[in-house]
């Protein structure tokens, strides 16, 4: 009887597990819905249909705007969608939620203007990107202004051409295994004459290569071009060169994307250390730096809060007045941030100013109402602790 009950329990658990897996599978399949966007243009002889892969929050966070990633290869869609979902689902860290656009399939009319550009016969491809493709995506979807171009082999080489010939199209380029040797665009010559003259604005260019049999014929040209780009890069242009030697050829775009995404959004996620050149200049310099990142590099707000908190923490013991002033500036800059008020409350508490600690922590609790339950619970517990300490202190 005991054995039967055990078997029955195992069977029930198994059924529940299968049901759970089924529900999870259904949820997962709906996380990144794909829509179609048809774009007609006088520059292309037939309409081009694109797959638009939307991030998980797109339909629910209707006031949110998103990064754009474009890749010319239709089969890159599952790769980008899967990597993006995995790398963004844990708090958009390291990959900020992104709209991914790829052609639905091969299109002869688009291929024609692509070939004309590669062969140096016309600039229709540049005009198509500037006049039709990117404006239509922006018209139909909520973009925040930051645009990434991704390409592999020939498409990577074309991406370098786009950067040099029309640098305002994209903010970042992920160029994996670019076919640079004897390329009709003569990219090494373009780099030598055009790269240093690009407009002085922030941009990111990742170029990667391997020693695979498919890449070997392009290694010498790759080394030449990347050396030129590293030397000639305009101010605020970050050139990132990677060699993924020993890895398979078809793994290159996966590796390139992983590395590049971390670098592209590093300034969003990583706070300035207190001993950095900018932080040493103080809170105002930190705020100015993040204003530059927001307005010039990304086109959306990048918070300075964690950098301000780090600087204040480093000064709290030996320069408490300076530390509190920094944290007060943080709450002035981010008055709706529970994290800003919590940091100031913690500073007051450490300095045994319990009354002010309670007042600030109450604001932290108030502004935490829209945060996940963990933060609501944690901040309420801190408020109780601060209040109890204040009461005990008053009773002494």
Q: Which residues does each predicted region cover?
A:
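A domain-start/cap signature at the N-terminus of enzymes
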Residues: 25-66, 330
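Gly/Ser-rich "nucleophile elbow"/oxyanion-hole loop immediately N-terminal to the catalytic nucleophile
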Residues: 59, 114-153
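Short beta-strand element of the alpha/beta-hydrolase
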Residues: 63-75
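Active-site machinery of serine-nucleophile hydrolases
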Residues: 75-126
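The feature captures the conserved acid-bearing segment of alpha/beta-hydrolase catalytic domains
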Residues: 183-238, 242-245
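C-terminal catalytic histidine-bearing segment of alpha/beta-hydrolase fold enzymes
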Residues: 213, 223-226, 233-301, 378, ...
């Amino acid at each position: 009887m005991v054995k039967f009950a055990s078997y029955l329990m195992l069977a029930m658990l198994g059924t529940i597990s299968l049901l759970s897996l089924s529900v999870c599978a259904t949820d997962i399949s709906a996380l990144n819905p794909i829509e179609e966007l048809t774009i007609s243009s006088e520059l292309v002889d037939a309409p081009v249909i694109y797959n638009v892969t939307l991030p998980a929050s797109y339909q629910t966070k209707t006031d949110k705007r998103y990064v754009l990633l474009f890749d010319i290869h239709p089969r890159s869609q599952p790769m980008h969608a899967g990597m993006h979902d995995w790398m963004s689902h844990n708090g958009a860290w390291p990959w900020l939620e992104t709209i991914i656009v790829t052609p639905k399939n091969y299109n002869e009319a688009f291929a024609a203007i692509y070939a004309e550009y590669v062969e140096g016969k016309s600039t229709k491809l540049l005009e198509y990107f500037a006049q039709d493709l990117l404006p239509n995506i922006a018209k139909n979807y909520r973009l925040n202004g930051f645009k990434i171009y991704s390409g592999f082999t020939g498409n990577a080489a074309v991406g370098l051409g786009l950067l040099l010939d029309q640098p305002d199209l994209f903010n970042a380029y992920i160029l994996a295994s670019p076919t640079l040797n004897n390329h009709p665009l003569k990219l090494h010559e373009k780099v030598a004459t055009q790269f240093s003259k690009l407009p002085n604005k922030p941009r990111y260019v990742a170029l990667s290569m391997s020693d695979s049999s498919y890449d070997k014929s392009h290694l010498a040209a790759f080394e030449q071009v990347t050396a030129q780009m590293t030397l000639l890069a305009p101010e605020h242009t970050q050139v990132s060169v990677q060699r993924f030697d020993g890895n398979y050829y078809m793994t290159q775009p996966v590796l390139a994307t992983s590395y590049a995404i971390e670098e592209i959004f590093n300034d969003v996620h990583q706070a300035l250390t207190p001993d950095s050149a900018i932080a040493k200049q103080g809170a105002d310099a930190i705020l100015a730096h993040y204003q530059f990142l927001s307005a010039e590099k990304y086109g959306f707000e990048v918070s300075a809060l964690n950098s301000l908190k780090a600087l204040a923490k480093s000064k709290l013991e030996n320069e408490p007045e300076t530390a509190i002033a920094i944290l007060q500036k943080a709450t002035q800059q981010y008055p709706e941030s529970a994290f800003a008020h919590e940091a100031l409350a913690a500073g007051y508490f450490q300095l045994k100013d319990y009354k002010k600690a309670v007042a600030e922590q109450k604001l932290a609790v108030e502004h935490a109402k829209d945060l996940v339950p963990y933060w609501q619970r944690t901040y309420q517990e801190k408020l109780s602790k601060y209040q109890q300490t204040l009461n005990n202190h008053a009773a002494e």
